[in-house]
Amino acid sequence: METNHRYPVNQLDWLLDDLVMRVPHITRAVFLSQDGLALGASRGMDQAATDHLAALASAFQSLARSASSTFGGDARQSIIEMTTGFFIVSAAGQGTCLAVLTTSDADIGQVAYEMAILVQRTGDHLQVNMRTRSALFLTR
């Protein structure tokens, strides 16, 4: 069994690999629980990189949820523009998020669209109870 970080390859990994391979300029992708536990990662990410990206995405999404509860509405997607690219986090399912890193050449509209499609495909099937990795269920 191939591993690209501390967890064995699972059903989420191949979806993330597909996203990275299909969408130009996406370099990394991670599914995570809202409390920062990595649930799946694209190829090429070691344990430290996966855990770091998941922790950053969790903190970023927490800020977005706080802002949206203060100002109204739900936090759907948050974007940080850096000189080297973009960091994008989207709510994915109950208690989960999708985070991607891109290069600066990325078409953010296309990336956001592809993330939304992936979230639509998986969001209803992802259920995570906080503080436990074993709480991930993929239902049919």
What is each model feature region?
Residues 1-28, 35-140:
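Acidic, low-complexity cytosolic segments
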